[in-house]
């Protein structure tokens, strides 16, 4: 099935490993050229190498640094062309801790990466998308953002904020053929940060198993495609039914 993405330039943050790497590979499979952005520049380069040097580049970037983000977007546009697709995958989750035990720096880091970082990257590419009258913005939330999470006060708060941000971007982009949608994953692969609660959380999944990075990546590829051109402001949960209630 042709998703109509051949030749599109996609920027994926947090693309050095795991979920971000899967997102990049899925979009490359559909014919996109990839800009892999990550604080870990070597990891970003490895993802780009796996895709192929002729179709992907890696860029070291701290997305909390607004000036660096602007500079990297300029590099990407020089190397690959204007950014058509922005996948805000980069995120941070601290070691699970209740509010009474949470460190202020953990709150600040969650806000800086999960929320401000998403703003910085989207803000850098959105005007060009509007001007060219085509664009796709994907923001990564979490089921914890929709439901709350024990010991995840900062993470849950920032992920719910990302939903509001994306839906507002959707309104601003709608008349310019720029869509903005949210992916809210559940448990995707082993997660060391959630290890104290991991087994109990998996038991809450209706499918009784964790998801794989490709499950999220395939959903992202669809939302970026021409087949999803009338979908904007949506929140797609990729949870295996973790958010469903049953007796």
Where are the language model's segments positioned?
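Active-site helix of classical SDR
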Residues: 122, 158, 166
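Substrate-binding pocket helix/loop in short-chain dehydrogenase/reductase
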Residues: 97-99, 103-108, 201
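Alpha-helical segment proximal to the catalytic Tyr-Lys
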Residues: 127, 171-172, 229
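Short C-terminal tail/terminal secondary-structure segment
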Residues: 1-2, 93-96, 147, 221, ...
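Residue(s) in the substrate-gating loop at a strand-loop-helix junction
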Residues: 142
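A conserved structural motif in NAD(P)-dependent oxidoreductases
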Residues: 205-216, 227
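Short, small/polar-rich loop/turn modules that mediate ligand/substrate recognition or access, typified
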Residues: 174, 179, 231-233
């Amino acid at each position: 099935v042709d998703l109509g993405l051949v030749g599109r330039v996609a920027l994926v943050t947090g693309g050095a490993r795991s979920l971000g790497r899967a997102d990049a590979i899925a979009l490359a499979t559909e014919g996109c050229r990839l800009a892999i952005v990550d604080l870990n520049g070597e990891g970003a380069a490895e993802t780009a190498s796996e895709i192929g040097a002729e179709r992907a580049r890696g860029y070291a970037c701290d997305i909390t640094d607004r000036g660096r983000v602007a500079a990297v977007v300029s590099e990407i546009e020089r190397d690959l062309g204007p950014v058509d697709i922005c996948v805000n995958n980069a995120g941070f989750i601290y070691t699970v801790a209740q509010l009474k035990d949470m460190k202020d720096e953990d709150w600040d880091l969650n806000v800086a990466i999960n929320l401000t970082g998403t703003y910085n990257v989207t803000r850098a590419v959105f005007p060009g998308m509007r001007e060219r009258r085509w664009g796709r913005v994907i923001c990564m939330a979490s089921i914890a953002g929709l439901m709350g999470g024990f010991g995840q006060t900062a993470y849950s708060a920032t992920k719910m904020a990302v939903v509001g941000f994306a839906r507002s971007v959707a309104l601003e982009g709608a008349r310019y053929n720029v869509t903005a949608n949210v992916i809210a994953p559940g448990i995707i692969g082993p997660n060391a940060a959630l290890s104290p609660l991991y087994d109990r959380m998996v038991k809450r999944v209706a499918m009784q198993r964790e998801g794989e990075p490709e499950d999220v990546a395939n959903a992202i590829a669809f939302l970026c495609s021409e087949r999803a051109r009338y979908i904007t402001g949506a929140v797609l949960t990729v949870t295996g039914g973790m958010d469903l209630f049953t007796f």
